[in-house]
Amino acid sequence: MSGHSKWHNIQKTKGAQDAKRAAAFTKIAKELIVAVKEGGGITDPANNSRLATVITKAKAANMPNDNIKRCLEKAAGAGGGDNYETITYEGYGPGGVAVIVETMTDNRNRTAGSMRHHFDKFGGNLGASGCVSWSFDKKGVLVIDNEDGDYDEEEVMMDAMDAGADDFEAEDDVFTIYTLPDDFNDVVANLSKYTFASAQIEMVPQNYQKLDNEDQIKLMEKLIDVMEDDDDVQNVWHNWDQD
């Protein structure tokens, strides 16, 4: 399994990512609200597994507990907040890079138009459902940043396997723990002594694709940026090998 290069890229552009923190919290807030609504209004993560998963993601992103609490109160209140639905789009970026875009929207026509526009503008094309998702695996992904050397690699690996992880990977100072989606919350609970730099369910590529053409690389970077900046977009998964 290829290294979790996205984490390295995030670190390289930390200043830019810090500027997007508020936007990231807004997206997570939307996920919290949807998790409560789709969980029958249950705000206790012990009885709402999807909510537990999103709360883990929120805490890894350093979202303040007060923010999380307000989102849960809003979701449980009268009307339950905005009426969002989750829609996933699939397509191809420049050079045939496979792209999956997860959205939460209150207007599917607006979002569908935006997705088609983004793909077309930056050298890609929007495809049919299932056109690329077959080449990805849905996994829980827990990332530990060990830049300070606080953790021993072998100990983390053994703890991860004992906790029920599906796979473990070490690259430079980053440890990545993979789980089956249904095991995610249990593995997180069993690894509570560790601090995660990120923690969520992801679509992990089965293989990666390089772009050697500089124009295609620039277009792919722009496509990812514009997708991630779209208010309706929650996650962008792709198989571009950026190393």
Q: Whereabouts are the PLM-identified features?
A:
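Positively charged, low-complexity, intrinsically disordered RNA-binding extensions
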Residues: 141-243
